[in-house]
Amino acid sequence: MKKTIWLVYLVLVLLPMGAGAEAAPSSEQFDPELAQTALQIAEMCYLPSMQASVLSVSGYRQVGLYNMDREPDDSRHVAAYALYDRVTEDERTEVIIAIRGTGEGEWKLNLDLMPSGNYDLPYAENFALAAEDILSTHQAYLDALVSPVFLVTGHSRGAAVANILGARLTDRFQAENVYVYTFATPRTVRGEYPAYANIFNVINPSDIVTYLPFPQWGFQRYGIDVELPVEDAALLPTAQAAYEQRTDQTGPFVSSLGKTEEMQKIILAMANLAPDVETGFQLRHALSHPGEATTDEPGMTADAFMLMLLSGGMTMNQAPSADVSSIMQTQNDFTPLLFVSLFSDADESTTWIASMHMPATYGAWMSALQ
């Protein structure tokens, strides 16, 4: 039997999709339309009732929602996700696993790269634990599937988990049966690893999250990176027009021209402060002067600084957070980073760093790519 996965018929969502079921190409061929569909499904993880309603139109049943409501002090390395399936006319089981991006209290988990304290691991342990939790939770379900085909998707935190989960499912069910589309994907693996031609990571090279953990630490991603053409001035009007038609905007459209170089400067400066994983988590930088902090003075690790920046400093308004403002008061190892084009121009209502990471920006530039 022909092995296909069917595009979901999405109605009343972020972008109009074609009616009916349209067969997707090979799992190893990037499909822009399926990518847009996957992004919408991933984004709707924040609205699970809408997600279930929309997918039910195409006959998908919600198998379950998992870890959606977490206490702020929940330190388990698990992901929030939804699982759907349907049986096709040719008796194949189509499974959708949509993994939510960062929720309340999860930024710390995002940056808790090696919770075991083993800094030599060849993978991002925090995200791998979340992927393995999904597999172990649904071991019996997976064992019972007959001729399954999977669509695995996620944005940001969800993308990292989806990247690893997609690789694990591919190892078990073969690449032709596993479609993986991730967006704003953190780095998940380093060293030698198999090539997964069915895993597509849609990347904005101006997005800070796609550089974490630092490439200088050797981290990459499973699969193939599909880099958005955000530095192409000729495509900028098309991307802006597509953005302005979306209902998931988080602020005005922000031009990405020149932002990739600025982001790479920020990442290089951060990596220079933390040349390896252990240094990033253990070395305390003084807050009142450049250099290492002594045992009796205030200090901050590079990891803690990134947590502060991403969970508090990367706000959707022009003003820096209180914690960021306090670090800006004195010269130290971190303050130069806060002035490397961190905040957008005065006439823009959102920080450019935040804007480059948002699903609406990704969707708009994917439209331009098409």
Model feature map: region roles:
Residues S58-T153, T170-T182, Y193-F200, E292-T294, ...:
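A conserved cap/lid and substrate-binding interface adjacent to the catalytic center
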Residues S26-S27, S56-G59, L65-V78, R92-E94, ...:
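C-terminal His-loop and adjacent cap/lid subdomain of alpha/beta-hydrolase
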Residues V8-P16:
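Bacterial N-terminal signal peptides
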Residues G154-G158, A162:
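Gly/Ala-rich beta-loop-alpha elbow adjacent to hydrolase catalytic centers
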Residues V178-K259:
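The feature captures the conserved acid-bearing segment of alpha/beta-hydrolase catalytic domains
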Residues I164-R168:
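Active-site signature of alpha/beta-hydrolase-fold catalytic machinery across serine-
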Residues M17-P25:
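Sec-dependent signal peptide cleavage junction
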Residues M1-T4:
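Positively charged n-region of N-terminal signal peptides that target proteins for export
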